[in-house]
Amino acid sequence: MGDGYKSLCENMGGVYLDGETLRFNPFANITDIDQSAERVRDQLSVMASPNGNLDEVHEGLLLQAVRASWLAKENRARIDDVVDFLKNASDSEQYAGSPTIRSRLDEMIVLLDQYTANGTYGQYFNSDEPSLRDDAKMVVLELGGLEDRPSLLVAVMFSLIIYIENRMYRTPRTLKKLNVIDEGWRLLDFKNRKVGEFIQKGYRTCRRHTGAYITITQNIVDFDSDKASSAARAAWGNSSYKIILKQSAKEFAKYNQLFPDQFQPLQRDMIGKFGAAKDQWFSSFLLQVENHSSWHRLFVDPLSRAMYSSDGPDFEFVQQKRKEGLSIHEAVWQLAWKKSGPEMAS
């Protein structure tokens, strides 16, 4: 979040999408409702209750609504059709003598109303042309604009999880696929068990499909602590490769007190002495692969440093040069000379 990947995306010829302009339709890419009904049901379930308060009866009724909506309109189905099915079921003779069932139907109607066409977030989830296209080779999604609307952010992020997982499994295994989630604690903070289940499944099985997930956070505690969500622990536990970079000294000391067996004394000491990359021109990190550990330094050339930079002044410099008519390549080139002239000249 924060446009940190905008320059990289443009340099690589990727597609850059802002969260404010993202558009979804849960029914958009379905070809077989028998294979996809539960996936759509899970998406609507998380949207309706991000904290996972729907029970098996709620979900059974919601699955009926999803199937009925698809059978009536196929890819033209919308969340409105799901809500209309629930309303008709609530008013039907079938449940006239079942106040508990009718109560659950009414609860879902209220919870999903905000995502209908005329609801608060309807514009995001009822599009005839969803933003994510299957022909794009690189897509960067910037969700910073949704931070002040946590319910919408949860709905969008889980919709993305489902879309990405679907792309992982339904594209040729000869095609390499990579999903990178930066500031991943926002994703991993979900309390809904479904999110953890999806992440656990994805991290365990994507390698069979020549895919990989990379999840980045500022603090190891986001992944591995008593406060970490089930989604965070699933990501950590199912990752064969772990890269530990510079940590906050205070937070890392606290973590080692709580989990004294996670790192050996030498490892704790070395990690604690990692310097800031901007001061030493390289990043130090500990690489853990299964039971093996090794130490590394990452050096990046000045042009790449300029392209990857998310510092405020660097970002503004590139944007100003773009306004002056320079291409993204020319703007990054000038930034590299501005920041590292002698190194560029050598």
Language-model features: locations:
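P-loop NTPase motor domains
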Residues: 1-2, 6-211, 276-280, 289, ...
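Short amphipathic alpha-helical segments
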Residues: 9-10, 192-193, 226-228, 256-257
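P-loop NTPase motor core of the ASCE superfamily
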Residues: 36-83, 227-346
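Short secondary-structure boundary/hinge segments and terminal tails
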Residues: 25-27, 224-225, 252-253
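Conserved H-loop
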Residues: 182, 201, 208-211, 216-225, ...
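Short acidic loop-to-helix transition motifs that present clustered carboxylates
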Residues: 2-3, 220-222, 249-250
